[in-house]
Amino acid sequence: MVAEAEVMHQPVPVLEVPYHRCVAKGVEEVAAAAAVAPPPVVEVEVAVQVPHMGLESAAGAPSISVDALQFVPSIRSGSFADIGPRRYMEDEHIRIDDLSAHLGSLLVCPLPSAFYGVFDGHGGLDAAAYMKRHAMRFLFEDSEFPQASQVDETYVQSVENSVRRAFLQADLALADDLDISRSSGTTALTALVFGRQLLVANAGDCRAVLCRRGVAMEMSRDHRANYAEECERVAASGGYIEDGYLNGVLSVTRALGDWDMKMPDGSISPLIAEPEFRQTMLTEDDEFLIMGCDGIWDVMTSQHAVSIVRRGLRQHDDPERCARELVMEAKRLETADNLTVIVVCFVSELGSPRQEQVGGQAGVARPRSCKSLSAEALCNLRSWLETDR
């Protein structure tokens, strides 16, 4: 049980066995191999189930092993953006690996702490650029943003409430800023890490994908017309879907800005800025998080993206290079949009490839074993080799 956190509220200023292998060719080599062979070793991977909380209740979540509770994420990240085939670049992103250091001593939060955001603009760059400049202010200058050194349910819920307020306040600010076109809007995908907790908030069709032992775990849902629950909400609020577009105009059903499509503040609107949340407690099984705009996901699956990044980390261990490789793959697959990717690593290194597909299950480690020869087996092998001669 995690110690209860003391939650305070304070305004915060923003700163920007090696294993032995031998092929015997003769009796002498067999004897030599037996003499230096290590004792029998069998490596077994034990799966750890982690509660996946967010829109669903955390009640009844499976327990977590002691080893999992001792895990501390080792955070590092890389990003890459490309204009793609478009004439203008409308994406923006934020990448802060050490949030506590970035905000200074006035913010008390569980460590390690980090913040990331991807903003995919439409109708011009205005809205996305505004979010890049002001997202930190909306989030962390909130007087009700919780401050605590430990994570408990109260703290997590308070952080979620603060992020929700930040999305909605930013949306209203876009309406009030006379320098921003009312037809300009942006999707918003953010990820907060505090301690071992990962909290993802999403409004729009950017996507966050967690790699858990090689398996893609989607940490957000695309707010598009093919999302059944969104279609129901749109219809209930007086909107409609035509040819895959909200009111025949916009490809997403949630976004910040786009005030030419929204009703006045307080009125029900088919297009909303309300984010959806997903959260999980990170363990040693959670290797990295991919955050990308829809230009990535239009041409590849979440699992494909995870496989590319995982292979890259094993080869060169550079998250920024992995982000670039993912963007280049999307261009090779002829994406039609701008491209932005952030790769956030939670472990210091992946090491050599050990997790292979076993019995149709990706991400399950293949057991390895090392064997030594008994004296009797050695004699039998010697006799067999001599007879074979």
Swiss-Prot record:
It catalyses: O-phospho-L-seryl-[protein] + H2O = L-seryl-[protein] + phosphate; O-phospho-L-threonyl-[protein] + H2O = L-threonyl-[protein] + phosphate. Binds 2 magnesium or manganese ions per subunit. PROSITE patterns: PPM_1 (PS01032), PPM_2 (PS51746). GO terms for molecular function: metal ion binding; protein serine/threonine phosphatase activity. It is an enzyme of class 3 (hydrolase). Mn(2+) 1 binds at D120, G121. Mn(2+) 2 binds at D120, D294, D337. It comes from the Eukaryota. Its cofactor is Mg(2+); Mn(2+). Its EC number is 3.1.3.16. InterPro entries: PP2C, PP2C_BS, PPM-type-like_dom_sf, PPM-type_phosphatase-like_dom. Residues 76-346 form the PPM-type phosphatase domain. Keywords: Hydrolase, Magnesium, Manganese, Metal-binding, Protein phosphatase. One of its GO terms (biological process) is signal transduction. It holds the Pfam family PP2C. Belongs to the PP2C family. This is Probable protein phosphatase 2C 47.
